[in-house]
Amino acid sequence: MANVALLSAASPSTSSAAPRLRHVARRRPSRRSACPRSAASRLSIMAALGEDPIRQWILTEGKATKITGVSSIGGGCINSAQCYKTDAGSFFVKTNGRIGPSMFEGEALGLKAMYDTNSIRVPLPYKVGSLPTGGSFIIMEFIEFGCSRGDQSALGRKLAEMHKAAKSDKGYGFYVDNTIGSTPQINTWTADWIEFYSKHRLGFQLELITQRFGDSAIYDKGQRLIENMHPLFEGAVMEPCLLHGDLWSGNISSDTDGEPVILDPACYYGHNEAEFGMSWCAGFGGEFYSSYFEVMPKQPGFEKRRDLYLLYHYLNHYNLFGSGYRSSAMSIIDDYLRMLKA
């Protein structure tokens, strides 16, 4: 992809009307199950073969003359993560031994789009490529995290500033399809938000559930909701804003100055309220919302729509982690069907 190739040139330098849900918020599951090949073994193999594109980039375009250390900094079975320490500073590297560059290309485009808004801090992506042992990598700016998630008020304000700054004249969608967790996320440009959210978010997840679990009951009810949800948007002014797309607590931090940092996006241009879809796993407080709505005013019917945006992520968690999330998703659907008399 030409757009991603350009990155390699960068150098480091609730109201009563709302449905009443019975689901219980829970922590997002860990993905640290056994992986087919560890990042360390892949790196060792590449070093032995003398074919390490990560080191090659760092020692050329990364402007380092030597790498002083490589340390693991977590990750899971989707990706592994390392910090490369050099005489030109540190680099954050993610690798995946099974998936080609397209996943990281989507991440890089999202990071760069958010970075270019000059609003909230995100790591700048430098390079995406293939690994000779199979799989792919992404090199990006290393941000030293502080001791906390930072100030909730600042997070709300800066997130709203990003939404306000980055609008799309192409409609709703993104330049490429990407992933939400490991689930494909379809981002075909669409002029109408309700159509986009119906087809490429709720509808797509419901189809996956049917394919993977044969759950026709949730599919049928979900389709009834999609067909009848238009009244939830009456009076709302909607514009395609750049969204992080997967804003849960694990993707929110702060730098050593206490400024908020967001990472690991699943970006697309969408209705700004959709950004709160992972709020059940993000810990947003009153200060966050107050500061956010000072910049991006709350639209009529916000409370009625809030759980509609939670639904996308509950359906995705059903697809990713199994039927433990089914009751939460079905609860939201049932409550909306009652409210809409559908």
UniProtKB/Swiss-Prot annotation:
One function term, GO molecular function aspect: protein-ribulosamine 3-kinase activity
Chain residues that bind ATP: E141, F142, I143
Protein origin, superkingdom: Eukaryota
Main EC class the enzyme belongs to: transferase
Active site residues per record: D246
Family membership: Belongs to the fructosamine kinase family.
Name of this chain's protein: Protein-ribulosamine 3-kinase, chloroplastic
